[in-house]
Amino acid sequence: MEDFVRQCFNPMIVELAEKAMKEYGEDPKIETNKFAAICTHLEVCFMYSDFHFIDERGESIIVESGDPNALLKHRFEIIEGRDRTMAWTVVNSICNTTGVEKPKFLPDLYDYKENRFIEIGVTRREVHIYYLEKANKIKSEKTHIHIFSFTGEEMATKADYTLDEESRARIKTRLFTIRQEMASRGLWDSFRQSERGEETVEERFEITGTMRRLADQSLPPNFSSLENFRAYVDGFEPNGCIEGKLSQMSKEVNAKIEPFLKTTPRPLRLPDGPPCSQRSKFLLMDALKLSIEDPSHEGEGIPLYDAIKCMKTFFGWKEPNIIKPHERGINPNYLLAWKQVLAELQDIENEEKIPKTKNMKKTSQLKWALGENMAPEKVDFEDCKDVSDLKQYDSDEPETRSLASWIQSEFNKACELTDSSWIELDEIGEDIAPIEHIASIRRNYFTAEVSHCRATEYIMKGVDINTALLNASCAAMDDFQLIPMISKCRTKEGRRKTNLYGFIIKGRSHLRNDTDVVNFVSMEFSLTDPRLEPHKWEKYCVLEIGDMLLRTAIGQVSRPMFLYVRTNGTSKIKMKWGMEMRRCLLQSLQQIESMIEAESSVKEKDMTKEFFENKSETWPIGESPKGVEEGSIGKVCRTLLAKSVFNSLYASPQLEGFSAESRKLLLIVQALRDNLEPGTFDLGGLYEAIEECLINDPWVLLNASWFNSFLTHALK
């Protein structure tokens, strides 16, 4: 039956049916008759609505293949097949705009011509029996019922069949075809008998032969046969006392459930050690841009041309010198690498025609910085499998680091507004269905709140840098290619602007596997003096390369300009995710949407406008040592976005582990706040699992300290 369903129905319908069954915890592979019934019902709903439109005069017309540009509105809104939240949003929206009474159960369609909801039924039994069951269930005069059967009969409220003869004939023919196809495969009888009122029955299949022997062997201890295990499972009352249940299951388990009280949880222990250091792939709050407005030079849009143009806007270059060496590196090599970049950029300008890409000379300083010839030689396993003491290198445990204040400052900065817009508002066509309309209104409000946010700049910077690096890694595998770090934005006045943050030089990049590493050296401009927080810049060698005149309230001041240089590495899979950082916008938009949905369901109307336009209302943003921080809806949007962006910029196994394990503790604490009297066993084990992820990662340590603030305030 399952194969038949997948062959017989459109893949979109099959996918919707699977989703619907999963939502109710049912398995399409087991309850195959139900699977077929849901697909059939979905298809009938779609056929009911197909080709029916309302024209400019408000008349109902049928268009099978006409002028696609005609201003037509679909006559029916399809509610069936959407997930529950979205379906109710559509229903609420229709009720608000048309004044129709809100149904108690989710209907299948809404008819804009007759202004009524429609409940569609497809039955394998007598139509009038099924009609009465439906009518009894929904108990509403307002919802119109229309029942079809597989034998070509139909029945509708007050014998009003809504559609024309021909449209209904199409549906009946399709149902008849499905029945014949099932019959020819010997599936029809089981399908016909499985309908029981509004429910279907599951068949219980017998297990025989090898499978039966395997089942008997794999029973839990103390069960003699599959039958008595089944009987035990069927009689298992899930909401009894947990200790009793555990001891029933196995003699070995003696879990003592401890009540979880306000005094139970302790704060997470954050590690000691030197302060943690910056580990992002590019500078964040400390980055400095050399920019050109309204770029119109020859070759505009070609990164190398843009970079040279940006470099020419700055006149304060001076002889570079090292002001913060890298602890373990050969610092003169970093200095030589920057001098080489300047020299080779100068060479380009002296050429007749500027090339589109620039491959650096393979000098000793670049070979050193890019780890050329440093990888240990690979030996075939066949050649060394007889070595008696073959073992993996002992690797040192990572040194623990303590939380430093810079990471909170980085996060605060990411939530702030810049004076440029980093994403364009999508130009969206006219919406036809109410749900599209709500979605695009929400998207526009959200975009307005975050388009100028610094986190959005990081997204676009990350997308551009990763795209350029992945392209170069594939196109110029053996070359040390010079890759400008560029982003684009618009000023307040709407003028285009191109920004240069610095340069990357990539090493050899024969990336066969997703996790193969390409080394690169990054050189980034900054006005931040590294001596103020030297621990943050442990992995960098910092040069002073110029003086920049800045306009301030007291007139022009000259500031030293620095270059932050470090060796770094990334992989195909990391670059692929970096290129997809725009997903962070979607993730935070969905979080905001769920807040709006919650408000809307309380008020029983769509609250989008009020949500974004009521400037006086404040919303909880997060926990700090001072208590629950609150802010405007725009601040909430930007904070959620910044969290999502930092999860991407600082992605790591430590973060994965911390998020998964701390969530368990969070749920227990929330249960306590909701007076659900939670109980736990092995709480110490959970703390251990959380704390083993707190090693040295700045973003994880910051999240752990936020978690501690949350614990303090949640348990007051």
UniProtKB/Swiss-Prot annotation:
<keyword id="KW-1190">Host gene expression shutoff by virus</keyword>
<feature type="binding site">
    <location>
        <position position="108"/>
    </location>
    <ligand>
        <name>Mn(2+) 2</name>
    </ligand>
</feature>
<feature type="short sequence motif" description="Nuclear localization signal 1 (NLS1)">
    <location>
        <begin position="124"/>
        <end position="139"/>
    </location>
</feature>
<keyword id="KW-0464">Manganese</keyword>
<dbReference type="GO" id="GO:0039523">
    <property type="term" value="P:symbiont-mediated suppression of host mRNA transcription via inhibition of RNA polymerase II activity"/>
</dbReference>
<keyword id="KW-1104">Inhibition of host RNA polymerase II by virus</keyword>
<feature type="binding site">
    <location>
        <position position="108"/>
    </location>
    <ligand>
        <name>Mn(2+) 1</name>
    </ligand>
</feature>
<feature type="binding site">
    <location>
        <position position="120"/>
    </location>
    <ligand>
        <name>Mn(2+) 1</name>
    </ligand>
</feature>
<keyword id="KW-1035">Host cytoplasm</keyword>
<keyword id="KW-1157">Cap snatching</keyword>
<feature type="binding site">
    <location>
        <position position="80"/>
    </location>
    <ligand>
        <name>Mn(2+) 2</name>
    </ligand>
</feature>
<dbReference type="GO" id="GO:0004519">
    <property type="term" value="F:endonuclease activity"/>
</dbReference>
<dbReference type="GO" id="GO:0046872">
    <property type="term" value="F:metal ion binding"/>
</dbReference>
<dbReference type="GO" id="GO:0003723">
    <property type="term" value="F:RNA binding"/>
</dbReference>
<keyword id="KW-0479">Metal-binding</keyword>
<comment type="function">
    <text>Plays an essential role in viral RNA transcription and replication by forming the heterotrimeric polymerase complex together with PB1 and PB2 subunits. The complex transcribes viral mRNAs by using a unique mechanism called cap-snatching. It consists in the hijacking and cleavage of host capped pre-mRNAs. These short capped RNAs are then used as primers for viral mRNAs. The PB2 subunit is responsible for the binding of the 5' cap of cellular pre-mRNAs which are subsequently cleaved after 10-13 nucleotides by the PA subunit that carries the endonuclease activity.</text>
</comment>
<keyword id="KW-1048">Host nucleus</keyword>
<keyword id="KW-0945">Host-virus interaction</keyword>
<keyword id="KW-1191">Eukaryotic host transcription shutoff by virus</keyword>
<dbReference type="Pfam" id="PF00603">
    <property type="entry name" value="Flu_PA"/>
</dbReference>
<dbReference type="InterPro" id="IPR001009">
    <property type="entry name" value="PA/PA-X"/>
</dbReference>
<dbReference type="GO" id="GO:0030430">
    <property type="term" value="C:host cell cytoplasm"/>
</dbReference>
<dbReference type="GO" id="GO:0039694">
    <property type="term" value="P:viral RNA genome replication"/>
</dbReference>
<keyword id="KW-1262">Eukaryotic host gene expression shutoff by virus</keyword>
<keyword id="KW-0378">Hydrolase</keyword>
<feature type="short sequence motif" description="Nuclear localization signal 2 (NLS2)">
    <location>
        <begin position="184"/>
        <end position="247"/>
    </location>
</feature>
<keyword id="KW-0597">Phosphoprotein</keyword>
<keyword id="KW-0540">Nuclease</keyword>
<feature type="binding site">
    <location>
        <position position="119"/>
    </location>
    <ligand>
        <name>Mn(2+) 1</name>
    </ligand>
</feature>
<dbReference type="InterPro" id="IPR038372">
    <property type="entry name" value="PA/PA-X_sf"/>
</dbReference>
<feature type="binding site">
    <location>
        <position position="41"/>
    </location>
    <ligand>
        <name>Mn(2+) 1</name>
    </ligand>
</feature>
<keyword id="KW-0255">Endonuclease</keyword>
<dbReference type="GO" id="GO:0075523">
    <property type="term" value="P:viral translational frameshifting"/>
</dbReference>
<dbReference type="GO" id="GO:0006351">
    <property type="term" value="P:DNA-templated transcription"/>
</dbReference>
<dbReference type="GO" id="GO:0042025">
    <property type="term" value="C:host cell nucleus"/>
</dbReference>
<protein>
    <recommendedName>
        <fullName>Polymerase acidic protein</fullName>
        <ecNumber>3.1.-.-</ecNumber>
    </recommendedName>
</protein>
<dbReference type="InterPro" id="IPR037534">
    <property type="entry name" value="INFV_PA"/>
</dbReference>
<comment type="similarity">
    <text>Belongs to the influenza viruses PA family.</text>
</comment>
<dbReference type="GO" id="GO:0039657">
    <property type="term" value="P:symbiont-mediated suppression of host gene expression"/>
</dbReference>
<dbReference type="GO" id="GO:0075526">
    <property type="term" value="P:cap snatching"/>
</dbReference>
<comment type="subunit">
    <text>Influenza RNA polymerase is composed of three subunits: PB1, PB2 and PA. Interacts (via C-terminus) with PB1 (via N-terminus).</text>
</comment>
